[in-house]
Amino acid sequence: MSQNGDQNVSETIGIVGGGLMGHGIAYLLAAAGHKIAVYEPSAELRITLPQRLEAIAALLDEDAALTKKISVHDALAPAMRGASFVFEAAPEKLPLKQQLFAEIEKLVAPETILASNSSAIPSTEIGRHLKHRERVLGTHFWNPPHLVPLVEVTQNEKTSAETVRRTMDLLRDAGKVPVHVRRDVPGFVGNRLQHAMKREAIALVASGVCDAETIDTVVREGFGARTAVLGPMEQTDLVGVDLTLDIAEVLYKDLDATPGPHPFLREKVKAGKLGMKTGEGMRKWTLEQAETVRRRLSQFLAGQAKARRKAATR
């Protein structure tokens, strides 16, 4: 049963990777009524996968019994058996992804769609050496994938229109909001937008304009307060393209244009200031503060996800 209450076709879907992204992708597709097989080479991740899936069900107030539709395997072949779709969520290393896709191609039917969840590596490169490149594309889920609705469906120069259509239909029926990215550029759409803002934020802090906490406050309590209901192109049309041009004439020449990562970012990494996991990054964090941020984000996104599912079944 799809998220909008309609009957949809149950697919057999293989998931490569049961870690940070893979387990959430497995859950949301199982919740949509599909049979899921996860390949995870790490024994530790295989052992913890059932508990992590049950935690998602508890967070969303859903029946944990649906996780029984998800099987876990320590070898690739059984997880690919009979799959009509394969979603790869392996570490962000091109040689690894290319090797996995080459092995997967030998195990599945020619019409099986092969999708990579890479957040930056173009699917053109991942599938470059495959025989059936027309069925390869990118499906960039946002973390956590079971809570954030967007999926960037990115075609490459060889991807067929049928591959895009089938993938968009599957994701839409699972309650996601897929968007079609027509060119396979690094970072796709979302990460390019996100990192354009992050580059300017880092430059502002590095140059002493403000501190990191001020950046976060300005985003959350300023334009971020409307971003969920008003995208940047809508906002441009709302205030006027002419006004946007006037502002751009004054502002754009002063925005940061550092080629490559800002030296300030490199200095943080060199000093071991890696963020919440080390107690300091752009800001300082206690264990309690870090946990509060994670819990606040999870509860907020879960509330939105439950509201969307409730609205879809009315």
Q: Where would I find each of the regions flagged by the language model?
A:
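NAD(P)-dependent Rossmann-like dehydrogenase/reductase catalytic/cofactor-binding core
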Residues: S2-G5, A32-H34, D173, S207, ...
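NAD(P)+-binding Rossmann beta1-loop-alpha1 motif at the extreme N-terminus of oxidoreductases
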Residues: S2-L59
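Internal alpha-helical scaffold of NAD(P)-dependent oxidoreductase catalytic cores
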Residues: H34, V153-D184, H195-A225
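Rossmann-like NAD(P)-binding element
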Residues: P41-E44, T48, A58-I113, I121
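Rossmann-fold dinucleotide-binding core
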Residues: I113-N191
